[in-house]
């Protein structure tokens, strides 16, 4: 059993028993600092583990561990259609090429680099939803500027094969500029990906671990070798729709590990191995990792709480999601009056995460910040004369696409609405009113206290 699993077991017991973790350590194994040592990554003997499990079993009614708190049913979606909006490639690509969100998000994430405290042997970063890799690549540039001689361990989660390809296109330049880098991509769930360890024994037995030591010293050589991964990815990086929840799930868990062959000696202690990998991240990026209309409990239990557990001492998780109250939502409400896809605020989410973590939250700081620090703006990039006067169809359509993408309006509703021209008229009115189009995101930070 790994440290994180032991900590989860102890945290659940302490929450159910209303017991301090130090008290648990003293009563179970006569060590008040047991939990603190586990969080530092210290190992325990089999005898100690047996005593922990025996104490929990003896203290619980029926001799069984406590049930998990805040059970959240999986989100139900129609498996036959109505797929998650952001998997529609056409709308996604039009949005990212006409709006500045990726750049602005990367700048906001970059501000956190001044507040982290990396420890040897590497600065460890996890991107909980890499997308096309634009945000991560920009953050890695900022990391190199601030920590030019520090080894990097960069891990990212992404289910989409197309996004994995786009991300890998950006890796050669990053490895050329910063050779002391280990780069990992996985398709595992949020509760699995930071540890590169599937929760299900069946999934763990079928896991595919692919390590590539890149030869050469130029980005061109790295690019050619990464391109050779194409057939492997097509064969193994596959997703199905869960018949139970209607959400995309991996067929088999996969981890791809990339690093430079000429830096293998330096990176040996950083390179993860199958069955022997850790989380302990200095920085976790959680930018738009959940659907706008997902429940606060789903976000807390399935996504943010597991990621918060993956922070090392002094580590920081920055979460970012859409805020609304901008010209984009004006377009949506002009067409669908009363529509409000952004009902969950950062304050509600952080309260739910704190509740879900239970006693494990004692080592964490939950920072919602004031609006002037949390909320930031990004724009649809257009020339001034394109959003005033007679607004062309292409500009109006780009603005409409951005608004419905951010609000995550389902395709069946879009098809019904776009049969007429009223949606473009409403879009033009908002563009003229504001002389442009912009959106607001809000951010929050969860940080683990330093030792």
Where are these regions (language model features)?
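Conserved Class I S-adenosyl-L-methionine
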Residues: 330-369
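A short glycine-rich, Lys/Arg-flanked "PGG" loop and its adjoining helix->strand segment in the class I
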Residues: 276-278, 298-313
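Class I SAM-dependent methyltransferase Rossmann-like catalytic core
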Residues: 76-120
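Conserved class I S-adenosyl-L-methionine
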Residues: 120-133, 154-155
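A short, conserved alpha-helix within the catalytic core of class I
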Residues: 263-269, 291-306
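Class I S-adenosyl-L-methionine-dependent methyltransferase module
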Residues: 134, 141-279, 402, 406-419, ...
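Short, basic-rich loop-to-helix N-cap that marks the start of a DNA-contacting helix
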Residues: 36-53, 386
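Conserved beta-strand signature within the Rossmann-like core of class I S-adenosyl-L-methionine
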Residues: 314-322
């Amino acid at each position: 059993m790994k440290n994180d699993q032991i900590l989860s077991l102890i945290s659940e017991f302490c929450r159910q028993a209303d017991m301090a973790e130090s008290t648990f350590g003293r009563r179970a194994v006569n060590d008040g600092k047991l939990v603190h040592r586990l969080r530092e990554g210290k190992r325990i003997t089999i005898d100690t583990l047996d005593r922990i499990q025996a104490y929990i079993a003896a203290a619980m009614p029926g001799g069984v561990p406590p049930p998990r708190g805040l059970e959240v049913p999986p989100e139900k979606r129609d498996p036959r259609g109505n797929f998650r909006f952001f998997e529609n490639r056409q709308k996604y690509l039009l949005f990212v090429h006409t709006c500045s969100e990726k750049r602005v998000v990367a700048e906001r994430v970059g501000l956190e680099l001044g507040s982290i405290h990396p420890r040897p042997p590497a600065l460890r970063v996890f991107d909980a939803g890499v997308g096309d890799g634009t945000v991560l690549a920009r953050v890695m540039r900022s990391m190199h500027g601030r920590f030019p001689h520090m080894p990097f361990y960069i891990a990212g989660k992404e289910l989409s094969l197309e996004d994995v390809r786009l991300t890998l296109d950006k890796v050669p330049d990053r490895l050329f500029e910063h050779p002391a880098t280990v780069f990992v991509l996985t398709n595992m769930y949020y509760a699995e990906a930071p540890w590169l360890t599937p929760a299900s024994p069946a999934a763990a037995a079928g896991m595919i671990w692919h390590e590539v030591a890149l030869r050469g010293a130029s980005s061109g050589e790295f690019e050619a070798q990464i391109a050779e991964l194409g057939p492997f990815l097509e064969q193994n990086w596959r997703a199905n729709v869960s018949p139970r929840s209607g959400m995309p799930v991996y067929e088999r868990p996969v981890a791809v590990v990339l690093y430079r062959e000429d830096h293998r000696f330096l990176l040996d202690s950083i390179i993860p191995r199958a069955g022997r990998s850790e989380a302990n991240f200095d920085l976790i990026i959680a930018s738009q990792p959940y659907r706008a209309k997902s429940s606060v409990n789903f976000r807390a239990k399935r996504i943010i709480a597991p990621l918060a557990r993956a922070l090392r001492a002094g580590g920081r998780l920055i979460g970012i999601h859409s805020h609304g109250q901008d010209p984009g939502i004006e377009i949506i409400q002009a067409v669908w009056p009363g529509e409000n896809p952004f009902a969950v605020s950062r304050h509600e989410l952080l309260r739910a995460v704190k509740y879900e973590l239970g006693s494990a939250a004692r080592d964490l700081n939950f920072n919602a910040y004031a609006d002037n620090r949390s909320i930031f703006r990004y724009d649809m990039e257009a020339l001034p004369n394109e959003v005033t006067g007679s607004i062309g169809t292409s500009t109006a359509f780009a603005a409409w696409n951005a608004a419905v993408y951010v609000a995550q309006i389902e395709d069946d509703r879009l098809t019904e609405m776009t049969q007429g021209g009223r949606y473009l008229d409403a879009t033009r009115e908002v563009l003229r009113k504001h002389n442009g189009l912009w959106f607001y995101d809000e951010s929050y930070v969860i940080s683990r206290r330093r030792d």
